[in-house]
Amino acid sequence: MATIESRLVEMLTVPVEALGFELWGIEFVHAGRHSIVRVFIDSEKGIFIEDCAETSRQVSAVLDVEDPITTEYTLEVSSPGVDRPLFTAAQYQAYIGEDAKVQLTMPVAGSRNLKGVISKVEGQILTLNVDGKDLIIALDNIRKGNIIAKF
């Protein structure tokens, strides 16, 4: 069965791309009777507040028609930001050599929260170097992944 995130990605990719943006990813946070749908958009020129507002209107219209979410929800549209979340193998691949943190569904090396350097991505397998040791992580075991911003 497809996750709500994957159904939303399938539903919203074309409308977001029609506006000239890339659908970077979607987070669905279910909190009791109220949920949050976070839609991340990106573009080579960057994302401005007007872009988020325009995308929010378009996404809201699609969600109103398709009605994939049965609970009350808040829609948030933003850029991925400097600590951008990572959703796909291609996104992890693009950030090889960068520091990242991942929250896992099942522990790896005794931990569900890891910080390290993205070493390699092969298919749906991520290699994360944590304290000098390469850890192999299946992408479907990652609940949440983010780049660690360097300042």
From Swiss-Prot:
Keywords: Cytoplasm, Ribosome biogenesis. One of its GO terms (cellular component) is cytosol. GO terms for biological process: ribosomal small subunit assembly; translation. Pfam families: DUF150_C, RimP_N. Disulfide bonds: none annotated. It is found in: Cytoplasm. Its main location: cytoplasm. CDD domains: YlxS_C. It comes from the Bacteria. Transmembrane segments: none annotated. Gene3D superfamilies: Ribosome maturation factor RimP, C-terminal domain, RimP-like superfamily, N-terminal. PANTHER family: RIBOSOME MATURATION FACTOR RIMP. Required for maturation of 30S ribosomal subunits. Belongs to the RimP family. This is Ribosome maturation factor RimP. It comes from Shewanella denitrificans (strain OS217 / ATCC BAA-1090 / DSM 15013).
